[in-house]
Amino acid sequence: MLIRRYEGNPILTKKDVPYPVETVHNAGVVKHEGRYVMLFRSHLRNGRSIIGIAESDDGYRFTVRPEPFLTPATEGDFALYEEYGVEDVRINPLEGEYYLTYSAYSRYGVRIALAKTRDFQRVE
């Protein structure tokens, strides 16, 4: 199999995001229920990172949802470790669920975090 860079790159830019972001990068894509789901990292104006979500039927033309998919926790156990952002998500399908590994960034440095979803609507 020969892999070629898509000549229409980039397939997603900050102009495609319906909320204010400074960047779009470091995406992961998986096929879920016949559609492509992309989770991507963005920086907000305050420098914090969030994870956005976009969907596509063909893997080239993506539509970004109106709200971010994963934002830093503001309360609970994760808030202390996500205060500067959530970054660089990876999507790992396993037995009908998707395990999401990502970097939680805070004054304590970078830590590995884990979340999961079945439907890319709700996250545990």
Predicted feature residues:
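Beta-rich carbohydrate-recognition and catalytic domains
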Residues: 1-22, 26-84, 92-124
